[in-house]
Amino acid sequence: MEVPEIEKQIGINLYSTDTTGLGGQLRQEIEDFIVKEITNREEGEEGKYLIVELTKRDWDTHHLTRTLSRILQVSQKRISVAGTKDKRALTTQKISIFDTDASEIEKIHLKDIELKVLGRSRKSVELGDLWGNDFRITVRNIENSPEETEALLKKTTDEILAQGGVPNFFGIQRFGSVRPVTHLVGKAIVEGNFEKAALLYIAEPFPEEPEETKNARQFVKDTLDFKEGLKTYPLRLGHERAMMNHLIANPEDYSGSFRVLPQNLYRMFVHGYQSYIYNIILCRRIEAGIPLNRAVEGDIVCFRNEVGLPDSSKTEKVTSETVNAMNRLLKLGRAFITAPLPGYNTEFASGIPGEIENGVLKELGVSLEGFNIEKFPEMSSKGTRREVLLEVKPKFEAGEDELNPGKSKAVLEFMLPKGSYATTVLREYMKVNPLQMS
């Protein structure tokens, strides 16, 4: 089945299942997307950190932590989370607040927010605490009858289970859902062209954007008149406006214009380009008929860490002598085949997997030295590897859609490790434009 054009733009050109798509739409209601964080934390009664269970509905994580810091009259730096959760969802996660009494939480009354004190700890909540997330997702407005939907759910699930999961693609969120430009900016940066990178981010219009935004971007793209452009750029485009203000004050300082952005944003550009290359390599492996759950000579595998998650820092290359033993570990779920997120110091596979990896780099004209970015060292990346198979065992049910008479709905439940995308699973069931999943 043909994939949408927007997915081809981010390096994904196939589905791993052969079934007809359900169609339908996500998030018709906020409660259609429920996420519960899984951590390895156990709280006690002592320590400087107050540990709180946060359930939020339709709140951005960063906006919420700013709001909590204002109400509690503490620095935002004293509030820690293990991971950022979807805004348009009902999500539950742990947060820690440094040097705050439990009684202070009772003073917080925010719409669509529930806070429950769990205890105290000597350690803040941090990214390393996160194992993964449990999802319960409702797909609505499906044209089929409930019986047809149930049959399709079963067929797709059977195919997913038979192949051990789904390809561990980077989803559209990694690149920008409405405006998938992140990897294009990253490519220009790796090629040393900061002017092109800045203009792509500031001024490249995309079809799904509002008309006024497209017109504003097109004007700046055509004229490079940042001063005049600022008059028409919507205030919500704060990052682009900040870059333009820098360029007005510092003409031609395109690399410097990226320094006005938050670190977590400017680091995403090179990561986005690496993710694009990874997606293409993963597609080529599938097209070559090489399994994702069985190693061949030359593959690089990684192993589980102490909490059971794939650890890309512990790798081994598969040889003719070790291939059988490695496949036993793969079958037991103790090892994982990987593909590269290339950088200036990445280990590449050999054999047929290596030919695929190096072939994609050559085809795209990628220079690994380019990932060592002298003008902006904080953007540099030595690269890493990522497991190619996302192990998932979905449970499902179908029924009448009470919000859309005459249509059916599907409910899917599954657990994913951190760093994976629910839409990577959902795309195999729905087979729709990713914008219908945002």
Curated annotation (Swiss-Prot):
Gene3D superfamilies: 1.10.1510.30, 3.30.70.3160, TruD, catalytic domain (3.30.2350.20)
Enzyme class label: isomerase
Matching CDD domains: PSTD1
PROSITE patterns in alphabetical order: TRUD, UPF0024
The EC number(s) this enzyme carries: 5.4.99.27
Keyword tRNA processing listed: yes
Catalytic reaction equation(s): uridine(13) in tRNA = pseudouridine(13) in tRNA
Gene Ontology biological process terms in this record: tRNA pseudouridine synthesis
Transmembrane segments: none
Pfam families found in the cross-reference section: TruD (PF01142)
Stretches assigned to the TRUD domain: 165-390
DNA-binding as UniProt keyword: no
GO molecular function, a single term: RNA binding
Active site: residue positions: 86
Alphabetical UniProt keywords: Isomerase, tRNA processing
Described purpose of this protein according to its UniProt entry: Could be responsible for synthesis of pseudouridine from uracil-13 in transfer RNAs.
NCBIfam families the UniProt entry points to: tRNA_TruD_broad (TIGR00094)
Family that this chain belongs to: Belongs to the pseudouridine synthase TruD family.
Protein name per Swiss-Prot or TrEMBL: Probable tRNA pseudouridine synthase D
